[in-house]
């Protein structure tokens, strides 16, 4: 399914991404796995884990930014939408 495909995972530096990414890289052979996250520090930390894997790319962005999302989606075959706000009162307030 994901073999030789480009996958974008929104919220990829979160808890779901930490499980999904290594599993996908091991079980399938994606052409590219783009990790979209608004958290630069989490991307920096995660980039160290995948520094030797040219299939893994990082993209700073927010799913609420339409122009940034259009740019991130260019050439993507599949989107795994895992972006979320975990703190319910914050999500309800905003």
Each language-model region and where it sits:
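Catalytic, metal-anchored helix/loop core of enzyme active sites in primary metabolism
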Residues: 1-4, 15, 55, 64
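Phosphate-coordination loops involved in phosphoryl transfer and adenosine-cofactor binding
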Residues: 3-6, 30, 76
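N-terminal Rossmann NAD(P)H-binding glycine-rich loop of SDR-like oxidoreductase domains
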Residues: 5-27
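Conserved Rossmann-like nucleotide-binding pocket used by diverse enzymes
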Residues: 8, 34, 59
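Glycine/Thr-rich phosphate-binding loops of Rossmann-like dinucleotide-binding domains
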Residues: 17, 43, 88-89
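Conserved glycine-rich Rossmann-like NAD(P)H-binding loop of the short-chain dehydrogenase/reductase
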Residues: 28-42
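Short alpha-helix adjacent to the SAM-binding motif of class I
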Residues: 42-49
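NAD(P)H-binding glycine-rich loop region in Rossmannoid oxidoreductase-like domains
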Residues: 50-94
